[in-house]
Amino acid sequence: MNPNQKIITIGSICMVIGIVSLMLQIGNIISIWVSHSIQTGNQHQAEPIGNTNFLTEKAVASVTLAGNSSLCPISGWAVHSKDNGIRIGSKGDVFVIREPFISCSHLECRTFFLTQGALLNDKHSNGTVKDRSPHRTLMSCPVGEAPSPYNSRFESVAWSASACHDGTSWLTIGISGPDNGAVAVLKYNGIITDTIKSWRNNILRTQESECACVNGSCFTVMTDGPSNGQASYKIFKMEKGKVVKSVELDAPNYHYEECSCYPDAGEITCVCRDNWHGSNRPWVSFNQNLEYQIGYICSGVFGDNPRPNDGTGSCGPVSPNGAYGVKGFSFKYGNGVWIGRTKSTNSRSGFEMIWDPNGWTGTDSSFSVKQDIVAITDWSGYSGSFVQHPELTGLDCIRPCFWVELIRGRPKESTIWTSGSSISFCGVNSDTVGWSWPDGAELPFTIDK
């Protein structure tokens, strides 16, 4: 092959390679264009679907929690959540809290709690045994999660609180201020909507558990006055965060604090704490017009702490060991009652659920079911009720649930702080089991040594 032929051959090969490369580039461009066109088309097609979904979510996100159903029939209690906040807080950033409670909308359940403006295992946790301080705030996080700065949202400045959802927005009630002039601040969807001033100037206080909503109205009970004598008690009816009606209970010789309230067939039942002279629990039930009835749980299975050994009950206050008390709850079923109580008669330890089929009206101490929740060797604390509406569960009844606070630290343990974790259970009509679900943290922490 002479030099000219070599040049022609090499040139031809280069030309072929160039043409092939050009065709590949053109093909690549066409492929990208087609792919982009398809994606763009899909995006255009998806936009109406996305908008429809968004609008649909907004439409179903606003309902009315009717509260007209009856409580679901149940045979026992299934464990619902456990946050392990103290165990996690030995190493992680977890709030120092007390008075946790749970409330559910038609979309979710949240744990509400009163912080001390401090984290566990930190210097600011010192002295947090104190109930009322300007640093306490109501916050909330998804149920079952340890309350931390990373998953919690601020709700209100408060050392006493309540919260509930009417199907449209969250209502929060936060009480703060001096003992002789505290004010409850009502917020609806995070916006201040109303206030309630202390009317007896003696530690205005509320439920420390969820308020109750029926047909768009929400209801709460507040106390103002002595913790060891006759005080004043009011029921408030609120709509979209504004007080529309209130009534003061005519209840001589009764003492109501820290009521646990729930809806049942369109009415509200509250089971409360008698800190004055009752080792059984007082109750108040009322309709949406605030027409009310009052009484004490008659059962000889006593629900408060401290309390005497079970015996003969009374439909009035049972005086032995009646002074002082602890927040608690019960669920009424006709003449029967599910009673939640500490296992110990004189300390906040252990927890159990008891079914007394005649206990709402009968004074004997017989019962037919006992389910263990926390062993007597482990600390418990406050407890309270909450419900899950049919709009959340899909059932045709209101599911009863409860939570138990598991207090750790002062005054019973050698720490500089007081805090707690929580567990919760919901009523079911299927198999359940009794056991012990304690807090489980090993104390003291590093900050305590």
UniProtKB/Swiss-Prot annotation:
SUPFAM superfamilies membership: Sialidases (SSF50939)
Membrane topology: Single-pass type II membrane protein
Cofactor requirement: Ca(2+)
Catalytic activity, reaction form: Hydrolysis of alpha-(2->3)-, alpha-(2->6)-, alpha-(2->8)- glycosidic linkages of terminal sialic acid residues in oligosaccharides, glycoproteins, glycolipids, colominic acid and synthetic substrates
Regulation: Inhibited by the neuraminidase inhibitors zanamivir (Relenza) and oseltamivir (Tamiflu). These drugs interfere with the release of progeny virus from infected cells and are effective against all influenza strains. Resistance to neuraminidase inhibitors is quite rare.
Binding site for substrate: R98, R132, E257, E258, R273, R348
InterPro entries named in the record: Glyco_hydro_34, Sialidase_Influenza_A/B, Sialidase_sf
Disulfide linkage: C72-C397, C104-C109, C164-C211, C213-C218, C259-C272, C261-C270, C298-C315, C401-C426
Binding sites annotated in the UniProt record for Ca(2+): D274, G278, D304
EC identifiers of the protein: 3.2.1.18
Signal peptide boundaries: none
Processing and modification events after translation: N-glycosylated.
Domain of life (superkingdom): Viruses
Virion surface-side positions: 28-449
Compartment annotation: Virion membrane; Host apical cell membrane
GO biological process per UniProt: carbohydrate metabolic process; viral budding from plasma membrane
This protein's record includes keyword Cell membrane: no
Comment text on domains: Intact N-terminus is essential for virion morphogenesis. Possesses two apical sorting signals, one in the ectodomain, which is likely to be a glycan, and the other in the transmembrane domain. The transmembrane domain also plays a role in lipid raft association.
Other notes: The influenza A genome consist of 8 RNA segments. Genetic variation of hemagglutinin and/or neuraminidase genes results in the emergence of new influenza strains. The mechanism of variation can be the result of point mutations or the result of genetic reassortment between segments of two different strains.
HAMAP family, per the entry: INFV_NRAM (MF_04071)
Protein's name according to its UniProt entry: Neuraminidase
Organism: Influenza A virus (strain A/Silky Chicken/Hong Kong/SF189/2001 H5N1 genotype A)
Taxonomic lineage of the native organism: Viruses, Riboviria, Orthornavirae, Negarnaviricota, Polyploviricotina
